[in-house]
Structures are given as C-alpha cells and as structure tokens.
C-alpha cells in the first residue's frame, strides 16, 4: 500500500497580540485536497524527508505538529498522529518553500527513468545516477543522443517498443507543472501576499 499525504494550509491571524482579537493564532485556510491528490515519493522526500529514496536533504522533515495548530487542523490530524495511524508529521512556511533552489539536484541520483508497454499502460520506474545502471540500459536502451541529466523531461521509444521517460530530480520538475504542487503554492502565495511569508504554513502528515 502506498504512502499518502494529508494536511492543510494555515495562516497566522493578523490580530494576534492585539486587544480586539481573542481567537486562535493560526487559522485553517484550505485542505491540501483537492489542491494536491498525488503520491510522488520524490517530492515527499525533497520537502518532508518521507520516502526519501533519492537522498535529498529535506526542507522540513520531522518537525511534528505545531503546538499552536489551528483547531480545524488539530481535529484533522492530531488523533491519527498520536495513535500512530499517521507519521512524518511536519510543517513548512511559505517563506521556506519560496526559497527553494529550482535547479537543486540530490547528490546520489540525478533523475528517474520510467517505462511502460503501450498496450497495457502499466508503468515501472527507477531512480538513476548520472551513469545509468546496466539493468535500466538493458530495458530502455541508452538515452537519446544529446541527453543531459540536468535537463528534461525527455520521452523516447526504445527499440523493444517500450515508451520511456526521463525526468531530472530538479526541484522545478518535482514540484512544477503537472504535479499538483503549483496549486498548493498558488494558494499559499496569495495568503502570503496578504499576511506575510512567515505567516503562512502547510501542515502535513502521512499514512
């Protein structure tokens, strides 16, 4: 069974510390779903250190749930995390996400190669270093001429008919168009434009 992500976007209420505001400091703005509904372990590893097979230095791993969690997100996550039904609980601010280097690559692997049979659509994949392992080369053949491990994605058809795809493990690919993360980031940025980069955060846990 695969690992899935759950969570919500919160913002810090601008009235905290004033005489007129008596509510909780952090307010739930929007659930992670329907903005993000995928299970990309490379992205999970990059951001949160979960299923980090690529060996990223994660941005925000193992922080736990914030002590000042909003009531709505507390009801969503706290009991499941406490029972052990979810783990990897952590949080990250928009300021930290906005500071990610889009061209960053992990040290061990530079990309991932996937392949599928046209008739079945069933896909297989493997993380690869700059020099592809022999078993990958035997399946997909060599990468096309002019291949650059830092660029892509790249699609080709192998001599055996397999449809192949290479994706670099760059931040802008793992979190870019088609991944679902741009929707999350768009909401967080809109909130940050109003409340400040450090006053918007994403709180998550995994099952």
Write out the residue ranges for each language-model feature.
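Acidic (Asp/Glu-rich) sequence patches and key acidic residues
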Residues: 1-197, 207
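Conserved GNAT acetyl-CoA-binding A-motif
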Residues: 199-202
């Amino acid at each position: 069974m695969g690992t899935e992500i759950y969570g919500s976007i919160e913002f810090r209420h601008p009235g905290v510390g004033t005489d007129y505001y008596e509510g909780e400091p952090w307010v739930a703005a929007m659930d992670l779903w329907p903005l993000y509904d995928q299970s990309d372990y490379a992205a999970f590893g990059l951001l949160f250190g979960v299923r980090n097979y690529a060996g990223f230095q994660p941005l925000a791993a193992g922080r736990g749930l914030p002590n000042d969690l909003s009531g709505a997100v507390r009801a969503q996550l706290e009991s499941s995390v406490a029972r052990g039904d979810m783990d990897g609980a952590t949080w990250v601010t928009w300021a930290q996400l906005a500071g990610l280097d889009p061209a960053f690559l992990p040290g061990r692997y530079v990309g991932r190669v996937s392949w599928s049979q046209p008739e079945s659509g069933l896909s297989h994949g493997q993380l690869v270093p700059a020099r592809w392992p022999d078993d990958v080369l035997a399946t997909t053949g060599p990468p096309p001429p002019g291949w650059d491990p830092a660029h892509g994605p790249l699609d080709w058809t192998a001599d055996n008919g397999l449809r192949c795809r290479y994706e670099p493990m760059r931040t802008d690919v793992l979190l870019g168009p088609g991944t679902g993360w741009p929707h999350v980031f768009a909401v967080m940025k809109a909130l940050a434009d109003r409340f400040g980069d450090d006053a918007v955060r994403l709180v998550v846990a995994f099952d």
